[in-house]
Amino acid sequence: MSIINIVLEGISENHSSQSIVPVLELLRNDKTILSNISKLQLQQLVSRSLQLVRSSDSYSKWCGINLIHQLSSNYVIVAQSGVQFMSALIAVLESYNSTINVLILRNCIECLQVLMHEIRGKPALTREILTPKLSTIITLVMGHIQFDAETCLNLLYDVILHHPNTFRPFANKLRSKLLVFLKGGFGVEFVEMPTSLRKIICQTMAILPIIEKNEPEAKWGNDVKNVISEVTGILNVFDEFFNFRDDSSLGKLISKLPGRGERAELGEGDRERVFDDLSIDFNEPRSLLAISDQVETLLQLLKHYLVGGGITSVRLPLGLCLTLLEVVFSINARFLSYKSDVRDDEIRQLISTVLNRVHTSGIELLSSLLQFRGALVPHLNQIWTMLEYLVPMIQNKRIDAAEVVKNEAVFAKLVECVGLYLNLVGAVSDGASLVPFVDVALTLVEPRKDSAGNMQQSAADGQQKNQNKNKNQKNKIKKKNASSAPMSDILSHEHLFQQTIPTQTLLAVQYFFSQVITKVELPSNQHYKTLRFIIRQCVEHKNSNLEQAVPKQLRDLLVNTVLYPGYDKNNALPIVSSILIDDPIISVFNNPRLPALPKYHSMSTSMDNKDVTEVGLEQTTYQRNRNGDDDHDDDDDDDDDDDEEVSASKGSGKKLSAKELAIQNLMREQAERQKLDREKEANARIEKDAEHEATPSFAFQMEKRPREEIVEEVGKVEKKIKVGEHGLVKDTVLKSTVETVVDNKNDVANVSKNDQAQDAVGADEDNEGSDFEIPEINMELDTDEEEEGEEAE
């Protein structure tokens, strides 16, 4: 039985609830089933799927929708049955109500989205199937948006992006529904919605200007200014709590931002506003939290306007956005004092909580602007300055550690944001502006003993009081202190009461330090503290290295610590090497790899080897071979060298490493140089002995020969030497050559002339193709020997 028959049998009328799931798995995992299906089997499969979709049973309907989902991946099936599939799915949307399981609606919309994706881009299918049904689909999906907002908005977002003209009549209705979501009109506040739902709401809101027929870029720019002006209006509410006059620059910054009056001049009015006017009542703390909720919602919406990617040909107001963020960070209790009517500590604490949420939203917006990279580099100093406003300080410009730990989530995002902006540059010349952030990061990862320390301190105070009391009341009967037993655990096992640093905070600090040590030269104090934190991380992960892998963030930090040690007396290589055993960069420091030495082909060595083999040949044979084809000699030398290398590699019995080959080549070259030096010394010694031991007639006959023959004779002497084991010279041919000259004493002139002619011809041939160099001629020595020969005559 074939697989398609199993599929058809599984979706038959008498199918069970367990049989349809394996069929769906087969169709999803094996795409060749639908490619090899026959026409009759395809008709049966399509008809059975449509019957399941039209069924009144919820499970059967769900099975039919998912079957169409799998069949939509085949173009042939979509071309033949796409109209039927579209009609069946639209019928499911029309019949849906709140009493039906929401999974039916979700699967139906997802199946429609897949079917539209397969049809989109194909002109014939789009014209015949999608275009006639598109308006109906938009209407039905917008009508069910309150049941499953995320799924419906995903489909509507695709329709707006690919079919803006068709969606234009529905733009205002969709905008109204989105504003209801932003205001929390469906019973759930926007800030309490899932992250994915908030994202798709803001993305859909930001892409609506694309449907404008005329100047969509201008519409997008007006929307961005409206959002910024609304945020500015909400921030002005803090003027009721703080004295803005304490910071003279704050008023100037607010004046640069568009306000409600400018928005009214543009003709927008209150129609484009997202939120209504705020009503603050100190007796209702929830009204104060509405400030941070609205600011967070508007900043998220502004983020998707800037980086959403709906309209690409627009001019981004980066300067205006940075000014808005500077205003957000400047509203801070560190620089502004509370007004006299805000005296309640609880109200001040609530206002501080609202400010922390507002600052967190501003940091998230600033981090999202990293998409523009190079355009932000000229503003780096301004960005670091405005972020420094958030660092809490106490007297003597010290970090308020308690405030940092209390608002850990805010400062963890702050440190991570600074690290992300450091990644935009290769180096920072002035590291003084980053020192406060380094102190904040070090405070976040310091061992925390808040609860245990307080309990320990109170226990110590209690013991001190008891001791003082016992001294004053010596006569009273001693009673057992019931609270001493629990306090003893704190005193003896203090490490068990330490708080654990959250993983998210630890990852943010590790990334920040990884960027800082590579691009900033820190002061010695901060550098030593940073290195201490890194070593502490090494110690913590050293014992667990065998049980779990080192996280990537920590691995990068340790490698950068080795590459950028900072001060010479600090070296973390030993402990880092014990943790990152398999890291290729660390292994280079532990085992340096020297490059392989280059191999040089020594011409003198190859010629010496060739001459040694020709010692027993006659003088005429040697002269003929010497004046032969040099190219042939070079080829023979190369072959000999190759044979020696092959034999050496075979004799070794194993493959040598690059380091061993380099050492072997170096030793071979040293041996060759020593051999050449010994040969030169032997030749010089032979020439000297020949000059002193020769008879006058012998010297006369030798010096009578022409200068060219003497040069040739010197060349023969240099090339006819054999060196023994201990550097002694043996088996020279000087004797035989000299004896030949003495026996032919009468024919010296003729031989000299003939040899001179042959040498001239040989010299011409050598100049054409020979690689041998003519030895140097000692002109002064030849002249002296000629004069001595003439006197002897």
Curated annotation (Swiss-Prot):
Organism: Lodderomyces elongisporus (strain ATCC 11503 / CBS 2605 / JCM 1781 / NBRC 1676 / NRRL YB-4239) (Yeast)
InterPro entries: ARM-type_fold, RIX1_N
Bias (Acidic residues): 630-646, 762-793
Family: Belongs to the RIX1/PELP1 family.
Protein name: Pre-rRNA-processing protein RIX1
Gene label: RIX1
Alphabetical UniProt keywords: Nucleus, Ribosome biogenesis, rRNA processing
GO cellular component: nucleus
Compartment list: Nucleus
Source organism superkingdom: Eukaryota
Bias (Basic and acidic residues): 672-694
Purpose: Component of the RIX1 complex required for processing of ITS2 sequences from 35S pre-rRNA and the nucleoplasmic transit of the pre-60S ribosomal subunits. Regulates pre-60S association of the critical remodeling factor MDN1.
Pfam families recorded: RIX1
Subunit organization: Component of the RIX1 complex, composed of IPI1, RIX1/IPI2 and IPI3 in a 1:2:2 stoichiometry. The complex interacts (via RIX1) with MDN1 (via its hexameric AAA ATPase ring) and the pre-60S ribosome particles.
